[in-house]
Amino acid sequence: MTHGRAWPIPILLLVVVVLTAAPAPAQTRFVFANESPYDTLDPHAAFDVGRVAVRLNLYDGLYRWLDNPAKLEPWLAESHTVSPDGLRYTFKLRKGARFHDGAEVTAEDVRYSIERILALKKGAAALLSTMIAPDTTKALDRSTVQFTLTKPASIFMAVVPEVHVVNAALLKQHEKDNDWGAAWLTSNDAGSGSYMLTRYDPAIGFIARRFAGHFLPWGPKYIDEIEFRLVKEDNTRVLGMIKGDYQGTGGYLPNDQVKRLREAPNVKIVEQESMRIMMFQINNQRPPLNDVHVRRAISYAFDYDGFNKDILGGSVERNPVPIPNNLWGVPRDVKGYTYNIDKAKQELAQAQAKVDRPLTVGYLQGFSQTEQAATVMANGLRKVGLDTRLTSELWPNMVERMKKPETSPDLVVYWISTYYADPNNWIGEMFHSGQWGTFKASSFYKNPKVDELLDVALKSTDRKVRDKAYQEAARIVVDDAAGVWIYNTKYFGPWAKNLEGIRFSPIGNGQEMRWVYYAK
């Protein structure tokens, strides 16, 4: 028989005291049910709200939009200066910021990041490439980076947060065939954000744990692990919130689902004013939609009040122009189109183009409001005498379709969210012909006068000049019926009742998790 060695009594007592006095802290976990898939983790490959959680939680930029109304705050940069001619922006990086592998964040990483964005020609590249040319950004020293613009741009600072900084040395290790590490970064992490990736499956979502070494000090309470999971159906997300399987989900649910969540004892609804326009883009380049009278007929065929007031219960505000009502640049005298079948038929009678085929109306899988809107549009068009064919896609797939006039549906309904708080985020990116190839510009609208006005607004730093130019451009776009603008939304964010620290911003929709914690 063998005997284990007996521990002396004092040591046993010491072990008991240590184990009872210092228990390991419980790990806190948060699961967000997202409407659309995370098909890539590359922060430079996507520029939409559906995948914003990746950019906000795994990565940092020089500045960040915070709170509501949104304010631009220093982030990786501690300060910046602008040259008198408005062309050179010089940023001083804060000391102590590190990537998830421990490497220091330097000016060279910032320079590499903007060059990578411009080279990949994805995500925010369509916007940034109008202001910055390749090989013009300089790392003056380890903590100073300078951007030289091709021309003065009033929105440059507003879009600086979209320059998400990646670990240049790490990506260079994973480059293949000069791809800037794109294949590797699709499913990996090269950031410095508040959370670091632990697991990723494009069919499911991603999991990340708290990065204790983040440059921004953590408070006494925080969430240790976050998961952003694809859950396609509204009803499944709502039921999961009620059961406690999920602790957060998107804040733009149908009114009946919001009502269900309000009645759940373990859920709270965070209400916030927002800037998010729901609209149909009309493919202006495809016959017969290249006839303005056909487009006006479509605009008169949608039952705005029936959708906004009856289906959505008055939880949104009619927005008849391509700029949110609660922002400057809006022509207040423009009332837009109303639901009027007689006027729709009159416009159709004036059209030179004949509508001799069904019109395809696209909507987004997992976003039931878009299906409801597509159905309302189809019903209205049927009363005018036009046939339709409804088609749906997951958001990333629809984005790809909307990049070309040949593949985009005749009409497609979705939201234009806030990526930066400036009218250019809406009318400039939707209706300047230089933006073709992006999902925002899927109307494929081209009007030289509108391009000229939008260029004036983009270059000027005088708010009065910009306001006047945006108003005039909006009047023309509405008269041309380039799209169908339905409403400006309000955010009704479902969160677990015991969650605190939620900092909603219309830029990101409250999906930045570093301040969030469980109250008990």
Model-predicted segments: where are they?
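N-terminal lobe/hinge region of extracytoplasmic solute-binding protein
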Residues: 33-84, 115, 190-192
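Gly/Pro-rich hinge or "lid" segments in bacterial periplasmic/extracellular proteins
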Residues: 66-67, 163-220, 225, 233, ...
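Append "and occasionally in soluble cytosolic enzymes with long acidic Gly/Pro-rich linkers
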Residues: 207-212, 263, 289-379, 383-384, ...
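Extracytoplasmic/peripheral linker and loop segments enriched in polar/acidic and small residues
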Residues: 293, 387-399, 428-496
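Long beta-strand-rich cores associated with HINT superfamily self-processing modules
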Residues: 493-520
